[in-house]
């Protein structure tokens, strides 16, 4: 923006440029219509700074890595690894390195997920052109845009990008496309007269805004603001100040991490004291030795209780959701947003192109002699029928043909089919006129040859009409005028203007834009404004609108059925927004659209109230969109925001989930968003919501599967330190009795990371629950560790503990009794019992995974073989477990011992107990809920 300004220019910089006469603006900026001198421009450049947007760098690589490590559970693991290596140099080095390897793997996964962070500000800079045509020293020259300063006079022509914010003072039929900034669906016809001080951005028709595109005509304007002082710069500033909102899943996982960290710390300290006390009282060791051995036990518990595999499981589940969403035309840029969609309570949608087709379409006609007609068909495809009073018209009347021909001749747009899709070249409004004519047999090219244009008076905002002179038939030449209905009607003598204007009001109430047409015979080759002043015959009205997508109505109905409110936030006019909102079922009964002018007068408390009862917002500016999203979030909503323009980027970033358009969306909006729709269709959002809910259900299944293992391992270790027999062990040359470990830290890591991930993965492929879109969104305040997950965790963990502890003690005592004949050492016997305990936990997980495939139904009801991935996972884990038990390298790493067939059968039977128990639990829960 401005680095430093003298007091006079500073005062001028705060003026509402659009509300003042252009000469006053030039005077306030100490500028003239001939532009600045080179010396004056150089001085101002030193004061104002370059006309560039501030760049704010994203997070560095090291910051991203630190973000993955700075997690309570990760610090527990790192601390455990360090302590293990210090306390027990023999086995502790191996255990510590394995634990650190797990930390590194988790860090790599998280870093890869977040590395492609949004770079929206760089894309904003790309919207500004590199060079501009500027008047310096009274001459037009090409200058780098960065050198523009307030007071420079800029020349604009069709195809130019506006290089800074300009107050226009001279123009000829200038039209500028501002959709990316304002949401206006058609190019804006510019003028030079002042407008109201409180006019919204889209109504400041005497301004040209940086980054917008000139589509027609020429103009001159004086630079009022540059760099971050422009409207584009304000968005840049808002985008830099807007922080990404944490997703419900990330919040929930963080809370789980805190709960687990505190719980693990408390239990580990308790084990440290109990273990040390037992070692000293029953084992006869000193305090230091007892403490050292108890520390190993506490570390083992910490490693066992931490769900190291959970981040990988969550990432895999979300990644599968990404693939499914991509197949449904929603490309996910940020993984956690997959789950967030499932808990969305409000969707704030732009209108143009998302809820509507972004293709202006003539939908109604009015003829002075025969009344109103309806035109069927939407978009630019020239297919549709004519109807009147509810019945189809088989033969198109002559007066209708004359009106449609006038629309085709008095415009410059063309229509053609490219790659199977009908497209226009030119103004969208004129494209609608050409399409309407083509629908009923008026071929544009032939008509324009048969009625060749001889002269044109282009549209001027001061005149509010366009006129064309054409070769006629035997009766001579004719003039056609097209423009604002009231302006056209004043020039006609064959019509009741009040009746026609009532029809204009009726069409406008439906949100349609109305153009009037008139003709008169003429006998001269040239065309002047005086020739167009009177004597016309009123041909009729053509009313058009950017129509709603037909499929969106069903999609919005599905959202309502799923408990999701849909709000339309658009830069378009109030009447159009209200009409579209009512057609789509968005507008609440009796509630009118709220305008940006009204929003600007509200404080935060008023905004929080207005968003409760109103669903349609029109003529909104970027800060209004941002304020509405924040108000909804303050009211406790999980908000999804759709958009395609630069003006949407701050709100996209602020919302819980930003959804950008892939076809019409700017790069700024795409990079600020979490999800990009490849078809720009609202129905894809509904499909993505359904997929998000399925992902969340499957994450709950994964949590219900993983957490019992961690709690069970903790219970096993707690039971062991309190009740297991002590074993003889040589420490520093002295025979003492030491605590008996049912599992080693490395074995616990095997269960948690390798085996658990292998079995939890199939749960991510489970089909959606039957009621997925017939229930309200999940309360964002509801913890992931809800009553169901907690109860299921304790139930399953208790069963797992009983099986693993029972079989460990059975195998240990059985082998100890037969050690004389077996020849096994006590260390080998302990290793065999530990291997059997691990295998029992693995078999428990195999059968428990089958139970977790559905939240409410038995595995036999949903179909045992309905998810083939389950059995791929089972096969993989059994193969890995066989290597764990019998492969010499694995035996060396994990200190395992080969098991007999009898031991394997017993482990499988103990694990299978969970299947009938959980089936009964589901049955009881379903009956109590009914």
Protein language model regions, located:
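Transmembrane alpha-helix/helix-exit interface in multi-pass inner-membrane proteins
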Residues: 271, 764, 801-813
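A C-terminal functional module that forms or caps the active site or interfaces directly
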Residues: 852
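Alpha-helical transmembrane segments of multi-pass integral membrane proteins
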Residues: 90, 792-807, 843
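Generic alpha-helical transmembrane segments
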Residues: 755, 834-849
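Helix-coil boundary and interhelical linker segments in multi-pass alpha-helical membrane proteins
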Residues: 722-743, 810-833
């Amino acid at each position: 923006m401005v680095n430093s300004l003298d007091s006079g220019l500073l005062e001028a910089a705060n003026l509402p440029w659009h509300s003042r006469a252009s000469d006053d603006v030039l005077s306030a900026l100490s500028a003239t219509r001939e532009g600045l001198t080179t010396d004056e421009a150089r001085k101002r450049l030193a004061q104002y700074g370059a006309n560039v947007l501030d760049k704010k760098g994203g997070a560095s690589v090291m910051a991203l890595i630190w973000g993955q490590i700075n997690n309570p559970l990760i610090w527990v693991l790192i601390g455990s690894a360090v302590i293990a290596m210090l306390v027990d140099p023999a086995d502790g080095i191996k255990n510590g390195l394995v634990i650190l390897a797990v930390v590194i793997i988790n860090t790599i996964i998280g870093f890869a997920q977040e590395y492609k962070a949004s770079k929206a500000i760089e894309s904003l800079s790309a919207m500004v052109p590199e060079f501009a045509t500027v008047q310096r020293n009274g001459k037009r020259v090409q200058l780098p845009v960065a050198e523009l300063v307030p007071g420079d006079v800029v020349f604009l022509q069709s195809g130019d990008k506006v290089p800074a914010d300009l107050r226009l003072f001279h123009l000829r039929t200038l039209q500028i496309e501002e959709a990316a900034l304002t949401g206006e669906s058609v190019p804006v016809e510019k003028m030079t007269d002042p407008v109201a001080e409180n006019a919204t951005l889209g109504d400041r028709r005497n301004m040209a805004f940086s980054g917008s595109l000139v589509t027609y005509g020429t103009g001159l304007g004086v630079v009022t603001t540059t760099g971050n002082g422009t409207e584009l710069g304000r968005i840049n500033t808002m985008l830099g100040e807007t922080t990404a909102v944490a997703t419900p899943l990330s919040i929930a996982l963080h809370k789980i991490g805190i709960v687990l960290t505190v719980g693990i710390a408390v239990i580990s300290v308790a084990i440290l004291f109990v273990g040390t006390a037992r070692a000293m009282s029953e084992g006869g060791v000193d305090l230091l030795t007892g403490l050292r051995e108890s520390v190993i036990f506490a570390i083992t518990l910490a490693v066992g209780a931490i769900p190291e595999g959970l981040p990988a499981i969550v990432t895999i589940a979300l990644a599968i959701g990404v693939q499914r969403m991509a197949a449904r035309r929603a490309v996910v840029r940020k993984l956690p947003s997959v789950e967030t969609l499932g808990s969305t309570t409000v969707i704030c949608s732009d209108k143009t192109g998302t809820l509507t087709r972004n293709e202006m379409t003539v939908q109604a006609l009015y003829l002075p002699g025969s009344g109103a007609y309806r035109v069927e068909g939407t978009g630019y495809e020239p297919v549709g029928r004519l109807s009147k009073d509810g019945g189809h018209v088989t033969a198109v009347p002559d007066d209708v043909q004359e009106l449609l021909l006038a629309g085709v001749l008095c415009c410059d747009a063309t229509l053609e089919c490219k790659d199977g899709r009908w497209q226009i070249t030119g103004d969208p409004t004129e494209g609608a006129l050409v399409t309407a004519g083509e629908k009923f047999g008026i071929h544009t090219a032939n008509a324009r040859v048969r009625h060749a244009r001889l002269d044109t008076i282009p549209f001027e905002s001061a005149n509010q009409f366009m006129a064309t002179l054409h070769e006629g038939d035997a009766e001579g030449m004719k003039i056609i005028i097209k423009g604002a209905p009231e302006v056209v009607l004043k020039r006609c003598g064959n019509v009741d203007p009040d009746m026609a204007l009532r029809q204009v009001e009726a069409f406008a109430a439906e949100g349609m834009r109305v153009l009037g047409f008139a003709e008169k015979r003429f006998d001269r080759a040239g065309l002047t404004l005086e020739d167009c002043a009177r004597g016309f015959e009123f041909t009729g009205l053509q009313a058009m609108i950017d129509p709603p997508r037909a499929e969106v109505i069903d999609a919005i109905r599905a959202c309502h059925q799923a408990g999701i409110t849909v709000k339309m936030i658009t830069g378009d006019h109030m009447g159009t927004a209200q009409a579209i909102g009512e057609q789509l079922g968005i507008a609440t009964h009796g509630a009118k659209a709220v305008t940006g002018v009204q929003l600007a007068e509200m404080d935060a408390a008023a905004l929080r109230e207005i968003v409760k009862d109103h669903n349609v917002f029109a003529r909104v500016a970027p800060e209004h969109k941002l304020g509405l999203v924040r108000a909804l979030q303050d009211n406790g909503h999980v908000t999804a925001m759709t958009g395609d323009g630069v003006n949407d980027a701050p709100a996209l970033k602020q919302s819980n989930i930003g959804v950008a358009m892939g076809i019409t969306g700017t790069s700024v909006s795409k990079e600020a968003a979490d999800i990009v729709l490849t078809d720009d269709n609202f129905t894809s959002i509904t499909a993505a919501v359904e997929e998000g809910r399925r992902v969340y259900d499957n994450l709950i299944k994964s949590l219900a599967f993983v957490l019992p293992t961690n709690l069970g391992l903790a219970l096993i270790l707690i039971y062991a330190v309190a009740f297991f027999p002590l074993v003889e062990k040589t420490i520093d040359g002295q025979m003492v009795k030491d605590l008996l470990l049912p599992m080693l830290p490395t074995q616990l890591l095997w269960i948690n990371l390798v085996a658990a991930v292998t079995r939890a993965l199939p749960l991510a492929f489970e089909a959606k629950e039957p009621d997925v879109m017939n229930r309200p969104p999940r309360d964002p305040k509801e913890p992931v560790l809800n009553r169901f997950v907690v109860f299921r965790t304790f139930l399953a963990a208790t069963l797992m503990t009983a099986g693993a502890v029972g079989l460990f003690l059975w195998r240990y005592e059985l082998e100890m009794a037969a050690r004389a004949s077996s020849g096994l050492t006590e260390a080998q016997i302990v290793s065999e019992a530990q291997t059997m305990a691990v295998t029992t936990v693995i078999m428990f997980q195999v059968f428990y995974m089958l139970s977790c495939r559905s939240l409410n139904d038995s595995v036999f009801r949903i179909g045992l073989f309905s998810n083939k991935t389950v059995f791929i996972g089972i096969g993989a884990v059994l193969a890995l477990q066989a290597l764990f038990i019998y492969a010499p390298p694995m035996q060396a790493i994990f200190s395992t011992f080969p098991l007999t067939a009898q031991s394997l059968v017993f482990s499988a039977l103990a694990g299978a107990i969970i299947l009938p128990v959980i089936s009964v639990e589901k049955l009881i829960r379903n009956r109590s809920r009914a």
